[in-house]
Structure formats: C-alpha cells, structure tokens
Design a protein with these regions (language model features):
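Radical SAM enzyme core and accessory elements
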Residues: 4, 258-283
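Conserved AdoMet/S-adenosylmethionine-binding subsite of the radical SAM
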Residues: 79-243, 247
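SAM-dependent transferase fold signal centered on methyltransferase-like domains
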Residues: 2-7, 20, 51-52, 74, ...
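Canonical Radical SAM [4Fe-4S] cluster-binding loop centered on the CxxxCxxC motif
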Residues: 36-71
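Flexible, acidic/Gly-rich N-terminal and inter-domain linker regions that tether
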Residues: 1-39, 43, 280-283
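Short, solvent-exposed polar/charged micro-motifs at secondary-structure junctions
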Residues: 8-13, 18-22, 129-131, 196-197, ...
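Residue-level signature of catalytic and energy-coupling elements of molecular machines
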Residues: 49, 216, 265
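Classical nucleotidyltransferase
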Residues: 221, 244, 251-264
Length: 283
C-alpha cells in the first residue's frame, strides 16, 4: 500500500490480536507499525531511538532520524486505506516522541481534528518537552519509569531524565492539570528479572508514584534478540502486581496484545539510512 508517495506499508505478520506492518519511507528507511486488537494503531515517530533502553529492540541500532508530520499521518492513512477503521492511535512505536516534538505535537493535533483519539508513550525527556506534551491535545500520556531507585533508572533508561528529576517535574506539573486530564496520565513499569523486581525497588517506586494519583501499567517483558535481559516469572509478576496494589496504586496488567512476540511492546525494529555516528534528535 502506497500513501501519497510518502511511504509504503507491507503487512508482515498477523496473529489473533495483532497485525504487524513494515513501513518503508521515501529514503528507504524502515520502521514498523502495529494494529492492536483490530482498531488501535501504534505508529513509529523516529527511525531508531536515542534513549538506548537495553531491553528494547527499537533503539538497538541507535537513532537515524525523526519522522516528519506527513510520514506520521501517512501511517494512519495507509492502514485505513486497507479498509481498517481505527478507533484510536498511539505514538508508542519506534522512537521517543519528545525527541520529535514539532512533528508529534502537530500529529496529535491532526488526530484530534479528524476525531481520532491519540495517545503517546515517553521516557520523559527532555523534561521541558514533557511539560509541553502533558498539556497537548492527547487522549493519554504514558511515562515509562521502570525503576524505584535512581541507579536502576540510569541503567534501564540511560538517555532519559533521572528518576528524581522526572518525579520532581511530574509532581510539579500534574497538579496544574484538570482532574479529567490527569486521569489520562499513567506510569509504566516493565518488570525485569534481577533488575527491578525486588520488593524494595517496588516499594520505592510506589512511594514516588503514590502522591501523583495516576495509574500504573505493569508490563511484562517481551524477549528480543538484541537484549540479554529477561522478564520476571509469572509468579513474580503477579506478586509485584499485588504488592503495588497493596501500596495503594491503581495497577493495570499487560494486555495480551502487548505481550505478543508479533508486535508487542519493545519488539518493533527500525533500519535507517544514516550511520549511527550521526545520530541526532530534532529540535
């Protein structure tokens, strides 16, 4: 499927919950998009990612470039052209949305104008852009935290803002939002065996998260070839879920669509045309 010469879309895998697409851009860079549960499209915002999370395939090759607004919109239009009406869109694929602020903010506005609810997932930095995005016309903002201790955060989200600075910004900015808008903000915690799954780490995370009054997405890890990290066992995952609930948090478990090897969280990949040494983020 060709979308106005901006990109081509090829379906490469299908399962009970997800349909996975390779998106080839005009310069032959490639990213991926996923249709979850038949009505939610996860789009990519960059070719690669500079945040360098060790558990995620999207940034394994570094960052090539950010996508343009036409390239973001074309992902939506190309899927709809296949006869697949979309109930919602999320900018949660390859890339860090806050590293492509102009295009992604314009994309959120475009989605709103056409009546398609749009959300995004971010590692939270740069922090001034997080402040800007929280008040943007989104239908959901998920901030990936993955840690209760600063050292763990630095290890798992090495190019994102530090834990204390991140929660400091959230603690300052969330009270400025309306109650309705605050309910659209959530935190994400990916549970990794031997990395961030101890009771002490979870308690520390809960102590930071509780005052914010937002929900927590407790994610299961999807194995990827570029990472040696492993997800916690199902028993440990359920234990963490119960602990966070006992700590007073509203916790949501991973949906089946998000834990499939076919397009689940952290599995999307990119292939860019720029050398890794020329990695950059847009202004």
């Amino acid at each position: 499927m060709i979308a106005d010469g901006v990109l081509t879309l090829e379906e490469v895998a299908r399962s009970d919950f997800n349909r996975r697409f390779v998106v080839t851009l005009a310069d032959q860079s490639r990213v991926e998009a996923v249709l979850y549960r038949g009505d939610t499209l996860c789009v990519s915002t960059q070719v690669g990612c500079a945040v360098a999370c060790p558990f995620c395939a999207s940034g394994a090759e570094g960052l090539s470039r950010a996508l343009t607004l036409p390239e973001l919109c074309a992902q939506v239009l190309a899927v709809e052209a296949l006869g697949l009406p979309l109930a919602r869109v999320t900018a949660s694929g390859v890339g860090e949305p806050l590293h492509a602020p102009d295009a992604v903010l314009a994309f959120l506005g475009w989605c709103r104008e056409r009546g398609t609810p749009a959300s995004f997932t971010t590692s939270g930095g740069p922090l001034p852009r997080l402040v800007q995005f929280l008040s943007a016309p989104h239908n959901g903002a998920t901030v990936s935290v993955h840690a209760g201790f600063p050292a763990t955060r630095a290890r798992l989200v090495p190019k994102g803002p530090g834990l204390e600075a991140l929660f400091g910004t959230l603690g300052e900015e969330l009270p400025k939002l309306s109650r309705k808008r605050r309910k659209k903000v959530a935190l994400a915690y990916l549970l990794l065996a031997g990395e961030n799954d101890s009771a002490d780490e979870l308690a520390a995370f809960a102590a930071l998260a509780r005052p914010l009054g937002v929900a927590v997405h407790l994610y299961q890890h999807n194995a990827v070839a570029s990472s040696s990290l492993h997800g916690a066992t199902r028993e440990a995952y359920e234990r963490a879920y119960e602990q966070l609930r006992a700590e007073g948090l509203v916790v949501r478990m991973s949906s089946q669509a998000r834990i499939e090897a076919n397009g689940g969280c952290g599995t999307l990949v990119a292939a860019g045309t720029l050398r890794r040494g020329r990695d950059r983020t847009s202004s």
